[in-house]
Amino acid sequence: MGKIVINCLSLVLLISANFAAAQSIDTGRGELSLTVPAGYEASTPAPLVLLLHGYGRNAGAEQDAYMKFSALATNYGYLFAAPNGQRETQGNQAWFWNASDACCNFQGSQISDVDYLMTIISKIKSQYNVDGNRVYLIGHSNGGFMAYRTAFENSQEIAAVASLTGAGATVAGPAPLNPVHILHIHGTDDNAFAYEGGDLRGNSYPSAVETVERWAGYNGCDIDGSEVAQLDLDRNLPGLDSIVVRYDNSCKAGGSAELWTITDGAHIPALSDSFSTTVVEWLMAHPKIASTSTD
């Protein structure tokens, strides 16, 4: 019996050692769940990934259930959180981010979500050993708008942004102080935020191409992109449904831009089994500066 108990205990320890653990931090808007990768050691800097949800009834946890980035935390060794934005007090009572003129602060909130996200990053850094060259933002729809704004205003902190359907600001501003790697993913049949750009409640938003070329310019890259690959990003579309266009010539160190166009892709694509892994691997390959830095 003693041997059986010991073997069972060993099995439990082995299983737990291979799965990420859920911790929590106080963000000022309540407790935020933080996924800590199995094997995390305070002596080794870990990347940090924040996932920003879209506008609607679903918030951070539901966004992660759709995109499944927390499930990859242990394999790639990153800390992960999917915070909630603000919630409307009237009408749909939807969750939203105060991101841009176009999307999606429809009730005129004066609360800064940029400050909130930077507070989250700061608090995680105060409790965990975060690699300062590998702080990443992923956003979907309104969350993509929010990721772009946060990176623009805090380019010294954010290494890269991956946005699914969320566009840049309505009006282009001067370049941020530091380069930021940009990955924009957009379906050509998006009926919420058109691939070609458009207007939402009287406020325009740029097209997918304009968003990427704007950031390519910010990063000092040539704005003539090159088609370099095809990907399978939507399981409901046949074959290699997405075209990769890369802007990485003459870029400043720590900056680049890339557009993944999902041909016939919708606003909420049926993500392929490889989607999240492909995005994470792209992020991890794009640190703010050389990964050997001790900053």
Positions of predicted regions on the chain:
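Primarily recognizes the serine-hydrolase "nucleophile elbow" in alpha/beta-hydrolase
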Residues: 125-129, 133-180, 191
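N-terminal signal peptide c-region/cleavage motif recognized by signal peptidases
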Residues: 15-17
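Serine-hydrolase catalytic machinery in alpha/beta-hydrolase-like enzymes
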Residues: 25-136, 146-149, 153, 273
